[in-house]
């Protein structure tokens, strides 16, 4: 049977939505019989934007906005075709960005 190593990277602006998605991926993988490493928490990235409230005067009056990006990594060290099919049929919310990286194709 061909086994592969799979890395699933999740990104979202909402940490609760991200944690629910990671939990559903982990439960689906464990039901299929996979060994799961993670979720591994990455530091959140905060982008800050500072703009003037007025269009051309009053430099002291400013408004601050920020975007927080949360990231998680889930690793499946030995995934086979049944696990991949189970993960493909999983429905995730629209606010979560998913990147899947498949490594290897060794005979195990």
Swiss-Prot record:
Belongs to the universal ribosomal protein uS10 family. InterPro entries: Ribosomal_uS10, Ribosomal_uS10_dom, Ribosomal_uS10_dom_sf. One of its GO terms (cellular component) is ribosome. SUPFAM superfamilies: Ribosomal protein S10. The gene is rpsJ. Involved in the binding of tRNA to the ribosomes. PANTHER family: 30S RIBOSOMAL PROTEIN S10 FAMILY MEMBER (PTHR11700). GO terms for biological process: translation. Keywords: Ribonucleoprotein, Ribosomal protein. It comes from the Bacteria. Part of the 30S ribosomal subunit. This is Small ribosomal subunit protein uS10. One of its GO terms (molecular function) is tRNA binding. Signal peptide: none annotated. The keyword Transferase does not apply.
């Amino acid at each position: 049977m061909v086994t592969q190593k799979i890395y699933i990277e999740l990104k979202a602006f909402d940490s609760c939505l991200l944690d629910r998605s990671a939990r559903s991926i982990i439960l689906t993988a464990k039901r299929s019989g996979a060994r799961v490493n993670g979720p591994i928490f990455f530091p959140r990235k905060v982008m800050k934007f500072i703009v003037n409230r007025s269009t051309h005067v009053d430099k002291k009056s400013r408004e601050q906005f920020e975007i927080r990006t949360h990231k998680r990594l889930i690793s499946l060290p030995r995934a086979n075709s049944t696990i991949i099919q189970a993960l493909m049929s999983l429905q995730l919310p629209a606010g979560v960005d998913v990147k899947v990286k498949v490594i290897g194709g060794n005979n195990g």
